Amino acid sequence: MLKPAIMYKDEIKKQMQKYFYTDDMMYEVGELDNYVPEIADEPDRYCFQYAIVDSNEKLIGYLAYAIDWHASCAYNFGLFSFDRGNPIVGKELFGKMEELVHKFHRIEWRMVGGNPVEKSYDRFCAKYNGTKHILKDAFKDRNCEYRDYIIYEIINEENK
């Protein structure tokens, strides 16, 4: 279930800090930096931040995205699972993305190649006749291996 992230602000920060200097953090940030989201006490109309919780209200993930209302575009998605393999995280992510595909003209998101969620993103993108762009060898990871940047876009022609 999605809850406003402000309700779990401190817990989200602590969970994110556990992943500093890891590949999981690289997949979240898209580079070698570490990151803790700045969760707004009073969110504006452009940024949406959610805690993903299970039926016991236990924090299992974090989801954020931005909206460009003028362009009718949802973008800048960020997802972090604190409970690897928990299907609720994927269910909530793709449920929200599905909602946004039908509400806006365009949604776009990026990821680092090799991210375990890539096949799920590919299926979701294909379901809505989206496009996957690959920027080959876009940066080097901590092991000096090249990684691709992948950009997904889905255009809903009915929402212009």
Which positions does each model-derived feature cover?
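Short hydrophobic/aromatic beta-strand or adjacent loop that forms the aromatic wall/cage
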Residues: 47, 147-151
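A short, well-structured alpha-helix characteristic of acyl/acetyltransferase catalytic modules
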Residues: 1-40, 147, 158-160
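Conserved beta strand-loop-helix elements of the APE1-like EEP
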Residues: 152-157
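Acetyl-CoA-dependent GNAT
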Residues: 27-74, 80-85
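Conserved catalytic-core motifs of GNAT/GCN5-like acyltransferases
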Residues: 127-147
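Conserved acetyl-CoA-binding loop-helix of GNAT-fold acetyltransferases
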Residues: 85-102, 118-119
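Short, high-confidence coil segments that cap the C-terminus of an alpha-helix
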Residues: 47, 103-106
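Conserved beta-strand-loop-alpha-helix junction that forms the acyl-donor binding cleft
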Residues: 108-126, 139-140
